[in-house]
Amino acid sequence: SYFPPNIFYDRVLEGRLNWLFYAGDNNIAYYKGENILSDEIQKTYLSLMKELKSICDKKGIQLQFMIIPNKEQIYWEYMPTYSISNTYKRVDRFVDYVKENSDINIIYPINELKAAKKYWQIYYKYDTHWNNMGAFVGVQSLYKALDIPMTNPLNVEAEEVKKQEGDLVSLGNLDPNNYCDDINYNVIYKPEIHILQNRGDKIGRDDGGCLRPCRGSRSC
């Protein structure tokens, strides 16, 4: 059925069933398949990737490039009505270009995420990001590329929790009271480890240790 596009402050797109999507940075043009990369730009990007791979190879580092699909590529059914000019879009083309013209490892887990959404909500309704379950599925694709033992998402326990206000609510200057039913998950895939506290940059564990994510060039 026809659902007209409605954009708030040039940045937030209202979708079906109250879903929100990011409208900035040419996201809508990408969704419609319009902003295809030229051969010259693809060649330039690949050249930079090869340069980085060469540096990593000399240091004995295994390099993996991973592209995370935009939310609208996974939850297209909640998007407003748009005419799709090309279903073979820029990321699909670029991933194929890299694979056909180099030995660089590149991961684009769009099929894995589309399969996972049959069982869980894997992106936030009111935020641009994937949730913990989406990230878990994506990481398994990375593990596969690195030959690290994988965990089938269907075999893990996941506790559903409420998600607080998403970034799209703030970007669109929307009333948060109308967008308060989002979903996240606490994924329990290593029962021997219990999370005692999660304070942003440090997660306490019951064995006395802690998990600290690295950000940018910060050493850990």
Segment roles from a protein language model:
Residues 1-220:
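Extracellular glycan-modifying ectodomains
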